[in-house]
Amino acid sequence: MKAEDPDYRHIEETYDEGSQDYGDYFKNPHEFIEKDRQQFIARLPAGSTILDCGCGPGMDTERFSQLGYKVTAIDLSDRFVELVRKRVPNARVEKMDMRNLAFPKAAFNGLWASFSLLHIRASEIQETLSGFNSVLRDGGLFFAALHRGPKTRWVKTTISGMERDTYVQEWLQTDIEAVVRGAGFEITGSRPFERTGGRYPLLSILGYKSDRQ
């Protein structure tokens, strides 16, 4: 079932059409967020449950699974879901819209959203993050990597690895930090950075579900 909103439908179709190109381009976990990944892993107990939210071709799903974590991966793209089911057969992989997570409360120790949350409009981000908070256990970890812009805005731009245009939300760092805190998270790390050879400024946020709800 395709997304009803035309912009989100365009995002879904863009990744379906470019899934093989994207998967070939990004075969391994992004090295430019390895620092964040190591911090995320260091705080997770052995055997933790992780939701890879917007898993793409599954490079992080595979890494977490290899490390012994119990991984559930979701994506809006049918093609990515097919690819990841083959790539990581011991992970649970579902087609799902991250704006409407169909999981019980407190199901996961960690939620990983690497360059996926950027496809959610600012007007819907608070509700989406509240959904993330709901499926995390108390103290559960949250990570997101996003596009950083000169202002917070919804734009159409070219996706690396596919050379296809679709919609992304660019963020001012202070704006997204405020929204993350407003959704019940404590931020432990927030950094602007740029990928070598990349075309966009980026940012990452690492935090955990606060007990001050």
Summary of predicted features, one role per range:
Residues 193-213:
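Core SAM-dependent methyltransferase catalytic element
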Residues 168-183:
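Short alpha-helix
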Residues 110-124:
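A short SAM/SAH-binding and catalytic strip from SAM-dependent methyltransferases
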Residues 1-45, 143-167:
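Conserved class I S-adenosyl-L-methionine
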Residues 99-111:
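A short acidic, Gly/Pro-enriched loop at the edge of an enzyme's catalytic core
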Residues 126-138:
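A short glycine-rich, Lys/Arg-flanked "PGG" loop and its adjoining helix->strand segment in the class I
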Residues 51, 57-100:
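Class I SAM-dependent methyltransferase SAM/SAH-binding core
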